[in-house]
Regions:
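Bacterial Sec-dependent N-terminal signal peptides
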Residues: 1-29
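Post-signal peptide N-terminal segment of secreted/secretory-pathway proteins
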Residues: 32-151
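Conserved structural position within tetratricopeptide repeats
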Residues: 47-50, 106, 161, 205-209
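Canonical tetratricopeptide repeat
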Residues: 63, 172, 179, 186-189
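Structural signature of tandem alpha-helical TPR/SEL1-like repeats
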Residues: 195-202
Length: 211
């Protein structure tokens, strides 16, 4: 009887694992369709991001970033066609996309059982991060104007912090990006508004180190 129960439980676990893998594939397929249901795609991939069977797979996070990329492209298409579009949706999509691709890269950098690193995602995703990074300023400014200082700080701080991630180290952004001190100033400003003193100290030091 115990053996039967164990076998049943094992079968259910395997079935659920396959279901989450299918969710990842389905999410990507949906956003690539002619009439994508982005809400459904996000729901599928978000379930996979927290499930033990798929949350540690780089591809899960890569697809999550890809879903956000397609959402972003759809909104920008509407803007190009002079149709109504949601600017905050664009900025938040860029923010999430960047976080997902960073997590994908982190997991892909873990050596395999032979001690080798086979990161097949960085070459494609690093240029996307560079393209989307300015939207972190745009989003920060919009949240600043809406007096949502916590969200503004999230956007400004992520813009600055991206300059030092391994994924973009070849770009030497701390030296090449002359806007960083200005963004750091605004990060300090919104941090002061919410009395986030560690962030004030952190980004004040960023400003000092770049002058």
């Amino acid at each position: 009887m115990k053996r039967i129960l164990f076998s049943t439980a094992l079968l259910m676990a395997v079935s659920f694992s396959f279901a989450q893998v299918k969710n990842v594939k389905d999410a990507k397929s949906i956003v690539n369709g002619s009439d994508p249901d982005f809400t459904k795609a996000e729901s599928l991939i978000e379930a996979a991001l927290v499930d033990p069977t798929t949350k540690d797979e780089p591809n899960t996070w890569n697809v999550a970033g890809y879903v956000q990329k397609k959402i972003n492209e759809k909104e920008l298409e509407s803007a190009y066609l002079k149709k109504p579009y949601d600017t905050l949706k664009v900025y938040n999509s860029s923010y999430r996309m960047i976080q997902y691709f960073l997590k994908c890269d982190e997991l892909a950098q873990i050596p395999n059982e032979k001690g080798k690193i086979k990161n097949s995602y960085r070459k494609t995703n690093a240029p996307i991060l560079l393209i989307e990074r300015p939207n972190l300023i745009n989003g920060g400014v919009q949240y600043f104007n809406l007096n949502d200082n916590k969200k503004a700080l999230e956007f400004f701080s992520n813009y600055i912090d991206l300059a030092t991630v391994l994924m973009l180290e070849k770009e030497n952004l701390l030296k090449q990006d002359t806007i960083i001190p200005q963004v750091a100033y605004y990060a300090c400003l919104v941090a002061a508004r919410i009395e986030d003193y560690p962030s004030i100290f952190k980004y004040a030091n960023t400003i000092a180190s770049l002058y």
